[in-house]
Design a protein with these regions (language model features):
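C-terminal active-site/capping subdomain that shapes the small-molecule cofactor and substrate pocket
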Residues: 229, 241, 245-332
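N-terminal Rossmann-like NAD(P) cofactor-binding subdomain of oxidoreductases
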Residues: 1-198, 322-328, 332
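Acidic, glycine-rich segments within the central catalytic cores of soluble metabolic enzymes
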Residues: 166, 170-237
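Generic secondary-structure signature for well-ordered alpha-helical cores
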Residues: 21-25, 162-170, 180-183, 210, ...
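Generic structural signal for residues in well-ordered beta-strands
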Residues: 72-74, 227, 308
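Generic structural signal for well-ordered, non-membrane alpha-helical segments
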Residues: 9, 13, 102, 150-153, ...
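Short, flexible turn/loop "capping" segments at secondary-structure junctions
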Residues: 139-141, 197, 234-240, 300-303
Length: 332
């Protein structure tokens, strides 16, 4: 078993643990570090407003979470370099606080005794950025100890872009994600560094920024600098959709585009890219573990101009890619 510690037991940290409980994996979560009381963490794991009840017993024994019989040490340390990873025999740290998102900051986990760090966000200076299934081969175990999993949106965009680029060569493009609100927004109007995100998340459509278009160049170097984009946050708790508008190098037909995505979803990107002909809405894809759920009916083609669209569960799908990447690191 590979011993995993989760630093930050928020939306992604808890969803990763939930997903691990459903998978046959050699990963063992032995510790979580969060500044919240263990009893509160136990409740948040057991009862979830979007994922539902866990359906497995969760109790607290002092500073230990007991989840379906598995004992997980709970820590409350603000400084990653002070965490007892060496004493706990931790192999890999999942850095999921959203705070320590640079290689320099994440390196503190290595100093504390971990062998590798996976950052569940874009990370400046990371040894490699992976969108599992799309650029998995970029991982070089001997060289990469601090790995970024990019973001949920990058993981949804990457299969879309990769298939289209291979089919016809993307020259340039724009992406827009219509994204569920997140904890980083305000519940009610209040101060925020982004004046739009300052407004109440549950009652507004909120235009804002996304780093996904920039990050795609780290995953697919051939597309570096070719895409730009924006995000629109909307009043749903989970379930997002990304639209990619591109100009490609040659004329293509709509059927060529659809066939390329069908083939990829059944072959090299199986489990990461899903092909759908159903008239989906956001609630239909919650709980779907794919990174990217291609909505074939929304495909538009006009010669060299192409629009493709994919849904994604921005929590559950991304959490499964985190686990896939942890398993990749553990095996190498």
């Amino acid at each position: 078993m590979t011993r995993i510690a989760i630093n930050g037991f928020g939306r992604i940290g808890r969803n990763v643990l939930r997903a691990l409980l459903e998978r046959d994996s050699d990963l063992e979560v032995v510790a979580v570090n969060d500044l919240t009381e263990p009893a509160a963490l136990a409740r948040l794991l057991a009862f979830d407003s979007t994922a539902g009840r866990l359906g497995r017993p969760v109790t607290v024994d002092g500073d230990t979470l007991v989840v379906d019989g598995r004992r997980i040490t709970v820590l409350a340390e603000r400084t990653p370099g002070q965490l007892p990873w060496k004493e706990l025999g931790v192999d890999i740290v999942l850095e999921a606080t959203g705070r320590f998102t640079s290689a320099e900051a994440a390196r503190a986990h290595l100093d504390a005794g971990a062998k590798r760090v996976l950052v569940s966000a874009p990370a400046d200076g990371a040894d490699v950025t992976l969108a599992y299934g799309v650029n998995t081969d970029a991982y070089v175990p001997a060289e990469h100890t601090i790995v970024s999993n990019a973001s949920c949106t990058t993981n949804a965009l990457a299969p879309l872009a990769a298939v289209l680029d291979e089919l016809a060569g993307i020259e340039h493009g724009f992406m827009t994600t219509v994204h569920a609100y997140t904890q980083e927004q305000n519940l009610q109007d209040g101060p925020h560094r982004d004046p739009r995100r300052a407004r109440a998340a549950g009652v507004n459509i909120v235009p804002t920024t996304t780093g996904a278009a920039k990050a795609i160049g780290l995953v697919l170097p051939n597309l570096d600098g070719k895409l730009s984009g924006d995000s629109i946050r909307v009043p749903v708790p989970v379930g997002s959709i990304v639209e990619l508008n591109t100009t490609v190098a040659r004329d293509v037909t709509r059927e060529e585009v659809l066939e390329a995505y069908r083939t990829a979803a059944q072959g090299p990107l199986a489990g990461v890219l899903e092909y759908s002909e159903d008239p989906l809405v956001s609630s239909d894809i919650t709980g779907n573990p794919a990174s990217s759920i291609f909505d074939s009916a929304l495909t538009r083609v006009d010669g060299r101009h192409i629009k493709v669209v994919a849904w994604y569960d921005n929590e559950w799908g991304f959490s499964h890619r985190v686990i896939d990447t942890l398993e990749l690191l553990a095996a190498n």
